[in-house]
Regions:
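ATP-binding Walker
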Residues: 11
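Conserved substrate/cofactor phosphate-moiety recognition/catalytic segment
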Residues: 17-60
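Small-molecule kinase domains that catalyze NTP-dependent phosphoryl transfer to phosphate-bearing small molecules
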Residues: 78, 83, 92-136
Length: 136
């Protein structure tokens, strides 16, 4: 199962992923770490597409091994989300603008999500993880 945690920079994607990972016993790929490993800091539309495909390949490998995998990354456009092709989408809709103006301009609100987080709290991760595990 591929879980996408998406949202603007600073919305709490990594915070949520870090807390959900042990509950789900999932593999976890953070976009910043993956970009660092690839030495690819291109945030242009083309760079974003490349990153979505990179995250997809990692997640698809984990899924093919029967594991749950969490990927947290901005995933700013419908094209990047389509490329990644998540089984579950969690949108961190906790802020209206992030710290990078180019990302704010590029970011498209997703049309379909499974979970929409509108505020950060100490229980979101438990609630969402429990619901996911009910359906595994």
């Amino acid at each position: 199962m591929k879980i996408l945690i998406m949202g603007l920079p600073g919305s709490g994607k990594t915070y949520l992923a870090k807390r959900m990972q042990p509950i789900l016993k999932a593999a976890w790929y953070n976009a910043d770490i993956v970009r660092e490993m690839a030495n690819d800091w291109d945030f242009s539309p083309e760079g974003r597409i490349r990153q979505s495909l990179r995250m997809k390949n990692l997640a698809d490998f984990e899924k093919s091994q029967g594991r749950i995998v969490i990927c947290d990354f901005v995933c700013p456009t419908s094209e990047t989300k389509k490329n990644f092709n998540p089984d579950i989408t969690i949108w961190m809709n906790t802020i209206k603008s992030g710290r990078y103006e180019d990302t704010n301009k590029m970011f498209e609100e997703p049309s379909e999500v499974d979970y929409k987080v509108i505020e950060m709290n100490d229980t979101n991760h438990e609630t969402i993880a429990a619901k996911i595990l009910e359906n595994v």
